[in-house]
């Protein structure tokens, strides 16, 4: 049998076996008792509903109401469990799709004597520049404990593949700057999308010196948000979001009247919520809105704040019935907003800074389309197209604008 045929047969067997194994693991996982979020268990929030007590103490009519509410909670729990299963299944399918090509590449490399090449994230490139004389262990499976730049310790990462900020002792030839010079340089670097990593590294180099300076702390939290946006690895994103949120908490505690502290704490809460269960997502949503409003109170002329509030209002206006019901069950009140309210915030952005961003024009077009004001929607689609695509957000907005334009022309 030719050597190539042998390789193909072995590859097919291994890939097939891996696929069957993953399928069996998934099947057993689904059959086991779930640890997914159970809504009633999370209702210990001060005004929690103790159904058994209510049934004993209330008159029969109120007891019937309590039973009905209990059944509503059970239905919501089942629906939430179903949604959780679907999300887990989607994630497992995604992982499987990613794993099989990598497995094939690895086997081909082993059979052909080749070395597997891994994709490198922005953080890996940054570390290579900073540690040109230090050889990284690209295939190590050992865990490493990363110290956060705010002086906190995070959980161990899974592999060395997740390249988090370099410890201070490895940084060489660091130029010492005073606080004003550091802030100016970090802000200037951050203006350029391709130099945000460099801005982050600069702040890392000076964390010990300025860790108690409020102007440094909120910028450092912002830099972690930038790293979250740049990263493509889930564990890295969690790492940056959590440390950034911790720094944001430190900032608002030390400077409760600093609008930028509230702004970036709100943003980091939004990032952290991406990895949380339903209750925490809703909780972080309230926290996001609370600190966004405080930031607007202290920075009424900052257009970015109104853009974020517009995004929040638009998202809330699109909540489904089940999402609203769950929010009401968990917190006793329902987040509410309208497309018109979202539009007013986007218009405020344009008033403060015309041509603020492609995304702002895109959301204005969406709002006008939802309000059936087609001419206005097309106007802002056209304005969005005129702005350059610089960031990933710009590119995503450009794609969305094309979809909106196409739908409006039908």
UniProtKB/Swiss-Prot annotation:
Molecular function in Gene Ontology: microtubule binding
Keyword annotations from UniProtKB, A to Z: Coiled coil, Cytoplasm, Cytoskeleton, Membrane, Microtubule, Phosphoprotein, Transmembrane, Transmembrane helix
Classification via Pfam families: RMD1-3 (PF21033)
Region (Disordered): 122-153
A GO cellular component entry from the record: membrane
Compositional bias (Basic residues): 122-131
Gene3D superfamilies, A to Z: Tetratricopeptide repeat domain
Stored SUPFAM superfamilies: TPR-like
Locations listed in the record: Membrane; Cytoplasm; Cytoplasm, Cytoskeleton, Spindle; Cytoplasm, Cytoskeleton, Spindle pole
Cysteine-cysteine disulfides: none
Membrane topology: Single-pass membrane protein
UniProt keyword Zinc, yes or no: no
UniProt family annotation: Belongs to the RMDN family.
PANTHER family: REGULATOR OF MICROTUBULE DYNAMICS PROTEIN, REGULATOR OF MICROTUBULE DYNAMICS PROTEIN 2
Subunit structure: Interacts with microtubules.
Name of the molecule in the record: Regulator of microtubule dynamics protein 2
Species of origin: Bos taurus (Bovine)
